[in-house]
């Protein structure tokens, strides 16, 4: 196997049994591809901005004399890059410029004669851009647009499960859902009449919509019913016979064929009878006249002479009506064919309750329903109906909707118009009646073939279109009004509504979320999240159990494990590892093709609908060496059911065992041994892990770690291969390989690293180089580790030595006992960075001022501020310290007339200011790591701001100069090589000034041209760098664009180092979470016979009832992995020969049943082996892929190889007494995470503080600096103890006795510890509430 440079440094032993057919796809592609489609020009105009423009333009004036046409658009360059936007708190966006053409037509001349054409580029607002990691920077914070799972447009058939009507009858309904426009519903009521609703308004008989489409009663009946013909022959009534229609009927008269009775009266007609009738080829049978009574006429029958209606269509026939028909000369007439079983008379019944009889009446009825209270006119009614479903401006099924619509109605063609047609409406009604008749099935709305994904690009496009439509109205009016000859397109377009719509979507939509930036995994998962909530989706309260449940079609598309616990369970899902969306927005998952029982390497992506047609085997189906399916019967899935089939019936096979789970679940080793509920908690808690100070790769992983770390974008990845030319803490320079160079390029790549920056969750983002000078790298290699990554692998926690045993009750109820050494070694120490901002505004009474001159503040409090009143970088501060001194002008105090007079004469303003400085919040401590000052344009900068500016300029200059030097060296290096090859000596070149080299001549003309090209490049490079520096300088010096009324903003960043302490929450990866109860001295911890203490002690009772056995297997395998590392460490210390090391490594990597990894240590160079051995001394990292992991036998073999007991249990000794524990204890290594639920953030205590306005009781919660509620049950407890005085104190002075508490405070200050309880304010509130009911209560003071 070929390993990249970074992978070679530490090769993970893989226990996977199956070869990977398909590499893990790029994890963020759902975001990036969707936005790319939105932003990139699309010549077809089907997607993105292009589609939005084409759908709104051209805009024609009301009179038709002018038209505004769309030509093209282009996006400009963003003003600031991503990092600058984050620092300045602005949106990372690019200006959108649209080329429009205004065409004026000559009114006098013939239609379509053009008078004037004007073209112009118009600015249409800013479009936020996506960063390369799939996020948006909005107002300085990183946000993610979560994809939405919504009901696909199309037609759906469903029933109410018998809940609507008291009889429990199942009522069927059909619903046509467009992408935009009015919903159209058809539904049956309990009497089997068919109704229609538009936009969920009141229902009308369904025939009304057909009448509005210009159907007559006859046409309606002809469309929905088959007919039976009757003929009067020789005084007998004959009926046309279709034998099949008689099946299941009971004969009410003898059915005679060719003189013989086939069915007697009262007998049921069976299949045998029908065969007999068909055999006799009977076309007509005689029926008694009574048989026709009650049948329904299929047509209008008018008297040939008088024109008078004899029978109208849909009229039930009586004997009299039949006689009338006969008299009028109608020897042959037709009635509707209906029966109870599968030809219901629904439309016929519906026509009876329909009051309208003409198209106009139907239109008026629809108008009244849509616009109650407005008087209908013919034009208005027609216009409304036309606009509802037949106007492309108001109604659009979209390509997806049309495809789903046509597929559901079993049409050949899947394309068509976006609006509805007559046929569409009729076909939907026909299909619904078919379902009611039992000839078709209803749809499953939770099937993933009926739910589609709406991603960023599509949602942004919709918002943009909304903005454009708002502009369209204004443009239409302006085109009709002003003097068009002098106007340009720019004067017609106002970009505000467009930018407002886009800004609103990115800033405050429910699906635009503050990115979860705890660690790389939480970022990746957030971007791959699929939500059913949001605009146009479900609401938590209304979502039932079915929508939330796992559906068979989730297989390989949505993860069945990862979803939040709580009210959102099942509504927020995560994409499976290999899942992707197709062109229509439906989720697809890959499968390997199987042909005649032979597995091929051909991979097809199938959507949920396509999958139903095939037989699909699982990835773990047994196979022979040559890739055939082994067993006779193979477990497989077909049409959503699990079943067994023969090998030759199998058509597809899963790509990988981890295909069904999401990224987070795929990171849990031995997931297959965990209960699903615990696996859910495990995948959710991994996202809350805080990056530790020193990342530590998991000893037991799953092989997914590298993919997550690289795809998340927190690491620095080489774009091209080459040699490391220079490396320090903040920059890596690569000299690019010759074969990867573009012609005429310096051949130097420079990567800048992010240092100690704050994340959205206040954790610390810091990148560290993991390459050395002179090392060769390939494209895609990891050059620097980010937060929670170690050598390019995800590292969320630490490998700790665990013992499963009780220890003096300190691990009761999932508590965790931790060794003090873990704290001393900073294993679980994390750095948190907090941002505190001080804003100076312009108030009515004058501007606020940032200054060190603060009234009534002692010297000590100002000791950490500089002369501008801003704290020094590096100062250590604690709660209550001043960070930024600020004073605010105070309001006028009540002045005496004399003072007023003096003020009026001398005009001096009140010199009163009050202290409004930024202080460190209570309970926060830390070190100031950075200060930033933003000053409004036109406001003078203070000394500190100028210092910061100078420093930034210096940094920028230094950076650019170094960068320039590196690139220049590259250029001179190439020209030197050319000149040396041309015969110039080293000495001569060294004596000359480098810039003179370009003046030397070379005989070979091609080389001379190349030298001239390089010289030209050098000049260009210098010019480019001067321009870059000027740009940088301008950006640093210019004032900042601050909100209105803000003069200055000072941001102070505090770094807090948090060690692990009792009360912090920790967890493993299997949902095994707990709180630290005690940090125990090293000497008291249980230790083994060599005196090595364990790091943490967990309760063994936490395992059996929770059924997450994966953690035990992880501990055993962790012990073996660590044991191998220790064995290698001993070999190094004994200075064994390199070939012995190679042999041992080969033995380790070859261990296992069928190992797909095949590491050949012989291929590695001696240096590679030394590096590898050095990295393995702390433990051999192993991978046990999900559902394809290490077997018990393999774990035992590895333990044996490491010279450890195969049971995984060892004898432990009590640290305090030195005695051995009674029985052996399971000891090993588990990967433990420290979660972002730290006791420091939760600890809180109040003495006095703010009170609620009405009840005067203290507020609750840490944010309000509130008190602890002494509730009803606590009162009972004190009552039970008879502690009357304590209780009185709780209910009065400590709560809402206003006078009492003030007095008490005063007494304490005076050193007098007495209290006098008074009347609690809540009692007064009660009195007032009773009085508001009209009952007067007064207290008699005796």
Curated annotation (Swiss-Prot):
Chain coiled-coil ranges: none
Record EC number: 2.7.7.6
The UniProt record lists the keyword Nucleotidyltransferase: yes
An annotated Gene Ontology molecular function: DNA-directed RNA polymerase activity
Superkingdom: Bacteria
CDD domains listed in its UniProt record: RNA_pol_B_RPB2
GO biological process: DNA-templated transcription
Function: DNA-dependent RNA polymerase catalyzes the transcription of DNA into RNA using the four ribonucleoside triphosphates as substrates.
Summary of subunit composition and partner proteins: The RNAP catalytic core consists of 2 alpha, 1 beta, 1 beta' and 1 omega subunit. When a sigma factor is associated with the core the holoenzyme is formed, which can initiate transcription.
NCBIfam families associated with the record: PRK00405.1 (NF001616), rpoB (TIGR02013)
Protein name listed in UniProt: DNA-directed RNA polymerase subunit beta
Gene responsible for this protein: rpoB
